[in-house]
């Protein structure tokens, strides 16, 4: 596959027919291991302006996904490899739902679609998560809202502690079913 490197995290597939297999998964995981934010993606769409965005994304369990929401967008995940809990929050940072996902071998659901704008983050339960994400374009940075109830990505110590707290809250949420 011909890839155009945009930066250490983003690669654009240049072929008219995009095919992704084990070699590309290994490539993405290697890229994610070595970059600062511990994630990497291959975009099947060619431009931020495309109406449909499809990405294969490898995310290390060491990566902090700042709780965020996308205004006016839907997104779906199909889990290719790994296990994750998608934690959904209200605007105050209270957990409203946990979506337990995994690849087909895991016994968990392997697909979800978030049709309405809601804050969410990922608790990755395996060393790596590989997802096929689909969302509507265009990508406009100002349509992604970062939750003010969570630390910024640059606050690495606080972010790590926050994720530990979210994991504990998520466990209690799942235990009590609320």
Outline where the language-model segments fall.
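Double-stranded beta-helix
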Residues: 96-98, 104-106, 121-178
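Short acidic-glycine-tyrosine-enriched beta hairpin
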Residues: 76, 90-120
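Short, charged/polar surface micro-motifs in flexible loops or helix N-caps
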Residues: 49-52, 60-64, 83-85, 92-94
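Conserved short histidine dyad/triad with adjacent acidic residue
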Residues: 38, 56-73, 116
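Glycine- and acidic-residue-biased ligand/ion/polar-headgroup-sensing regions
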Residues: 72-92
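Short beta-strand His + acidic residue motifs that chelate non-heme Fe in jelly-roll/DSBH
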Residues: 66-68, 86-88, 112-114, 120-125, ...
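A short, N-terminal "cap"/entry segment at the start of jelly-roll beta-barrel domains
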Residues: 1-52, 97-104, 159-178
């Amino acid at each position: 596959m011909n890839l155009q490197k945009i930066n250490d995290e983003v690669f654009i597939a240049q072929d008219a027919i995009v095919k992704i297999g084990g070699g590309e998964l290994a490539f993405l995981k290697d890229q994610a291991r070595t970059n600062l934010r511990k994630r990497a993606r291959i975009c099947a769409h060619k431009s931020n302006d495309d109406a449909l965005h499809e990405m294969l994304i490898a995310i290390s369990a060491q990566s902090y996904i700042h709780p965020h929401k996308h205004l006016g967008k839907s997104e779906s995940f199909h889990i290719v490899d790994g296990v994750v809990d998608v934690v959904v929050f209200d605007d105050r940072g209270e957990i409203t739902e946990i979506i337990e996902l995994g690849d087909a071998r895991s016994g968990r659901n392997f697909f979800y679609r978030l049709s309405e704008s809601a804050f969410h983050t990922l608790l990755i339960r395996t060393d790596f998560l590989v997802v096929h994400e689909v969302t509507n374009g265009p990508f406009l940075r100002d349509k992604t809202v970062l939750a003010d109830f969570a630390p910024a990505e640059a606050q690495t110590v606080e972010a790590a502690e926050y994720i530990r707290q979210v994991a504990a809250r998520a466990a209690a949420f799942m235990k009590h079913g609320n």
